[in-house]
A protein has these predicted regions:
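Conserved Radical SAM active-site core
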Residues: 1-113, 122-124
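Histidine/lysine/aspartate-rich catalytic loop segments that bind and position anionic ligands
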Residues: 117-147
Length: 147
C-alpha cells in the first residue's frame, strides 16, 4: 500500500464555482460520460482499518464529503473511522466550508484530521474565515485550480 492514498468515501460532485470546471474528476466524467452525481461509497469505509502502517488519506478528493446530499449520519461514520485509526493522517478539502462549519461540533476532531478549503480565486477568500473557525488541529488552503 502506498503512503498517500485517496479514500473515496464519496464520489461525484456538483458544480459550485468556476474552479469546478478544471476539476480532474469532473473533466474525466465529461470525457467518459460517467455519472457524476454524488454517491456514497460505504464499501470504502473500512479501508484505513486494514493497515496499521501510517498513511496519509486524501478523503473524497474529486468529490466533497460536505456536499448537501451526503447525510450527517454517513459523515459521522467517516469521522468514526478517522477517530479510530490515529496512526493515519486524513486530509479533507471542501468548497462547502459553510456546511462543514455548521456540522463541525457534531464530530470528534482528533489531531490526525486536517481540514482544508479550496479558494480558487479572490472571489472565494471568504471561505477562509469559515476554515479558521474549524476545530481541526491542522488547517490548509488549496488554491487548485488557481483562477
Amino acid at each position: 500500500m502506498e503512503n498517500r492514498i485517496t479514500w473515496q468515501v464519496t464520489k461525484g460532485c456538483e458544480r459550485l464555482s468556476g474552479g469546478c470546471d478544471s476539476c480532474p474528476s469532473y473533466l474525466h466524467s465529461v470525457k467518459t460520460g460517467d455519472d457524476y452525481s454524488v454517491q456514497l461509497c460505504p464499501e470504502q469505509l473500512a479501508l484505513p482499518t486494514m493497515d496499521n502502517t501510517p498513511k496519509i488519506f486524501a478523503v473524497a478528493f474529486g468529490s466533497d464529503l460536505f456536499h448537501e446530499s451526503v447525510p450527517l449520519d454517513y459523515i459521522k461514520k467517516v469521522f468514526a473511522v478517522m477517530n479510530d485509526t490515529p496512526q493515519h493522517t486524513y486530509e479533507l478539502a471542501t468548497k462547502r466550508i459553510e456546511r462543514a462549519s455548521v456540522l463541525a461540533e457534531r464530530f470528534e476532531w482528533t489531531n490526525n484530521i486536517h481540514m482544508g478549503v479550496t479558494v480558487e480565486s479572490g472571489e472565494y477568500d471568504w471561505r477562509i474565515k469559515f476554515l479558521q473557525s474549524m476545530p481541526s488541529a491542522v488547517k490548509f488552503i488549496s488554491a487548485a485550480p488557481m483562477l
